UniProtKB/Swiss-Prot annotation:
It comes from Listeria monocytogenes serovar 1/2a (strain ATCC BAA-679 / EGD-e). It is found in: Cytoplasm. The gene is argJ. The record marks T113, G114 as: Involved in the stabilization of negative charge on the oxyanion by the formation of the oxyanion hole. Signal peptide: none annotated. This is Arginine biosynthesis bifunctional protein ArgJ.
């Protein structure tokens, strides 16, 4: 597997574009991904019960068959809690995209992100779709068009050889606040020119989302609009992938690399964040327990503020373990921060405070927890909680 300098349109047969339609003051705010041939597709959605209109429209597109040729996305407006008119507007976005690209209606997915409750300005949406280019657009413009409070574009591309053919996979995501997925707002789109059955793609997506996107948190809020969509158009012309083969294992490894990179990028770009926090839990009896405990630690406001302040307060970590709901032995926990052991058998060790303080000034903080009761592990990612987070969200609508 090779990391390449690419974009969401790097896999064969894919194109992307983005434009400024006026939903936001300056940045691009509408874009699409287009495949020149129908692509096998898979998707997962927010677990928030107040799902936005685009979620329902995309689910409808998947009803007839698991194939897509395009994804239309707008930012600046979530089209959530907008009633029947919001649903009609999302359907209109799908219809206009299908008409312009000359593809079937049910081969278009729709995604939106932004302020909840405002009606879509359909005059701007319509004009924006008309501006988008089918095959001569700029993929970087799409990557900008999906952003809201994000401070940087989140993109990654890999290549590997499968069945004697070069296969490419690219991913792009947005997310900075309202991130606590349970597949926030989190949108992620993955393209690949690999040939893989839709059913196997859906199964793999669910596994990787549980290991990556569902293990990140910024502020504990789960969005109405979370969506991850994968398109595999087969243009690499590799033999159709089959589960249990060496080629499928290579593809799955590449998929893991893409989703993990995007997930960590979202966590690192949390609103007002200055540090990425990574929590690794080992020695659990079940993977689910390890993941649960890791996510509870990284979700703790007290752990997050301690990371912001450079305070190695292990009491906040042990407290989060205690209410996590995961299984552990209270008297047999080891905690390390940056490889420095600060707790052994649930008792504080003698450690180098100066070295710990210096480590906590770094931008990537790794907390290791060993439960010593099993062989399973899990990882979660988040960010610190700063003054800037409050400032951004206190003034979000203005």
């Amino acid at each position: 597997m090779e990391l390449i300098k690419g974009n969401i349109a790097s896999p064969k047969g894919f194109y992307a574009d983005g434009k400024h339609a006026g939903l936001k003051r300056k940045r691009n705010d509408i874009g699409w991904i287009y495949s020149e041939v129908p692509a096998n597709a898979a998707a997962v959605y927010t677990m928030n019960q107040m799902q936005a209109a685009p979620i329902f429209v995309t689910k409808d597109s998947f009803q007839s068959n698991a194939k897509l040729q395009a994804i239309i996305v707008n930012s600046g407006n979530a089209n959530a809690c907008t009633g029947n008119q919001g649903m009609l507007d999302a359907l209109a976005m799908r219809a206009q995209t299908a008409e312009k690209l000359e593809i079937p209606l049910d081969s278009v997915a729709v995604a939106s992100t932004g302020i909840i409750g405002d009606m879509l300005p359909m005059d701007k949406i319509n004009a924006g779709i008309e501006m988008l280019e089918k095959q001569t657009g700029n993929a970087a413009d799409f990557e900008e068009a999906i952003l809201t409070t994000d401070t940087f574009q989140k993109q990654i591309s890999f290549q590997t050889e499968i069945g004697g053919r070069k296969v490419t996979m690219s991913g792009v995501a947005k997310g900075s606040g309202m991130i606590h997925p349970n597949m926030a707002t989190m949108l992620a789109f993955i393209t690949t020119d690999a040939a893989i059955p839709a059913e196997l793609l859906q199964k793999l997506l669910k596994i990787k989302v549980d290991k990556t996107f569902n293990q990140i948190t910024v502020d504990g809020d789960t969005s109405t609009n979370d969506m991850v969509v994968v398109m595999a158009n087969g243009c690499a012309e590799n033999p159709m992938l089959q589960e249990g083969t060496a080629d499928f294992a290579k593809f799955a490894d590449m998929f893991q690399a893409v989703t993990e990179h995007l997930a960590k990028s979202i966590a690192r770009d949390g609103e007002g964040a200055t540090k990425l926090i990574e929590v690794q839990v080992n020695g659990a009896t079940k993977t689910e327990d390890a993941r649960m405990i890791a996510k509870k630690i990284v979700s703790s406001s007290l752990v997050k503020t301690a990371a912001f302040g450079g305070d190695g307060n292990w009491g906040r970590i042990i407290c989060a373990i205690g209410y996590s709901g995961g299984r552990f032995a209270p008297d047999n926990i080891t905690i390390k921060i940056g490889g420095i052991e600060i707790l052994n058998h649930s008792s504080q060790t003698i450690y180098n405070q100066q070295a710990l303080d210096a480590y906590l000034e770094e931008e990537h903080i790794i907390i290791e927890v060993d439960l010593h009761i099993g062989l399973e592990s899990g990882t979660a990612w988040g960010c610190d909680l700063s003054y800037e987070y409050v400032k951004i969200n206190a003034c979000y609508r203005t």
